Amino acid sequence: MIYAAEEVRARFARRGLSFDPTVEEIVRGILEAVREEGDEALDRFSRDLDGYPVEEVPKRAWREAYEDLDEDLRDALETARERIEAFYREEARGGFLRAEGGGVLAQLVRPLERVGVYVPGGSAPLLSTLLMTVVPAKVAGVREVIVASPPKVHPGVLAAAWVAGADRLFAMGGAQAIAALAYGTGRVPRVDKIVGPGNRYVVAAKRLVYGTVGIDGLAGPTETMIIADGSASPRLLAADLLAQAEHGPDSEPWLLSPDRALLERVEAELSRQLQDLPRAEVARQALEKGGLVLTKDLEEAFALANLYAPEHLSLALSDPLPWLEKVQNAGGVFLGEGSPEALGDYIAGPSHVMPTSGTARFQGGLAVRDFLKVIPVVGLSEGAARELAKKGALLARAEGLEGHARSLDLRR
């Protein structure tokens, strides 16, 4: 179905994360039990919900899984890791030390000590998710990266853990895994931050443990938005929309264009390609969540995209680079038909863990900075302190904090 821009504008404007109170109540009980009872509760929930007790998978099993992989798949994993490392190595530089009036002002950049990475289970092994979370953490210098993935852990996930350089891996999933990482148990160490996507129980658990540990964000269903002009290929556009639609029935694939003829050709192409797509029924449901939108021009298309704040924004334009300055809100941007979002999912370089549900308005994708903390350092000389103390005391008294002011008066 082709929508007019006005039909979707209000829907785009009110986007945001929503939470099921019933799910949160269930998750709250799991978190409390694991915090109070530790491994006993962790194993109980794991048996009840996943059918197996929690176990740590030894590194020899990772290596064996890696060695058992098809040679081409091993090479693809290695290439993906190398590209992710190269992309984030540039960001890892930081901090400064500056002389200041006989003293120093500095900014220390320090990696987190221990990070938990959640890798979902399910019908498809998410090898790429493990690479996209563990590798940036290791580039940042995180000392220990602990992976949690539901039992039985797929051999491909174990192989990816070996390639990415993870430190430990526990076969545990769901809210109970988040609880174990957040609070620590006898077997599972407490981490400083938890990253990675998951189902609604995992998302609810991350939301509830925030403050006890850090989190990367709260992920909803995946979404992609393509802005296209008449130069774009309907066949490629349809394929790119279906690549995201097959993720799940709640995915949202959108195509925005001022070219009605293009939208009509894409609509026909979607019907054709759906005929032999293995996950066609899932993709059909997702296409109903999204749609094709006719805009008056490209300017309106970009205004709608910024309102929607998509996880993925693809610019299928004859000359996409000049339009990049119009992008304000997006998790990641893919320029031209030669840079499909599916490449970003696996091997382009940036992490595919990106903000969803409109949170790209205030949050970026997972990166090295998510595994770093900044510590300011102030070391003023006696002369500089004396010079600043009078003005500092004035500010303190304006706030009604006499103790602060007196501390500064003694330096004058």
From Swiss-Prot:
Pathway: Amino-acid biosynthesis; L-histidine biosynthesis; L-histidine from 5-phospho-alpha-D-ribose 1-diphosphate: step 9/9. NAD(+) binds at residues 118, 176, 199. GO terms for molecular function: histidinol dehydrogenase activity; NAD binding; zinc ion binding. CDD domains: Histidinol_dh. Its EC number is 1.1.1.23. Its cofactor is Zn(2+). Belongs to the histidinol dehydrogenase family. GO terms for biological process: L-histidine biosynthetic process. GO terms for cellular component: cytosol. Binds 1 zinc ion per subunit. The gene is hisD. Pfam families: Histidinol_dh. It comes from Thermus thermophilus (strain ATCC BAA-163 / DSM 7039 / HB27). PROSITE patterns: HISOL_DEHYDROGENASE. Catalyzes the sequential NAD-dependent oxidations of L-histidinol to L-histidinaldehyde and then to L-histidine. It catalyses: L-histidinol + 2 NAD(+) + H2O = L-histidine + 2 NADH + 3 H(+). The active site is at residues 311-312. Substrate binds at residues 222, 244, 247, 312, 345, 399, 404. InterPro entries: Ald_DH/histidinol_DH (IPR016161), Histidinol_DH_CS (IPR001692), Histidinol_DH_monofunct (IPR022695), Hstdl_DH (IPR012131). It is an enzyme of class 1 (oxidoreductase). This is Histidinol dehydrogenase. Keywords: Amino-acid biosynthesis, Histidine biosynthesis, Metal-binding, NAD, Oxidoreductase, Zinc. The keyword Metal-binding applies.
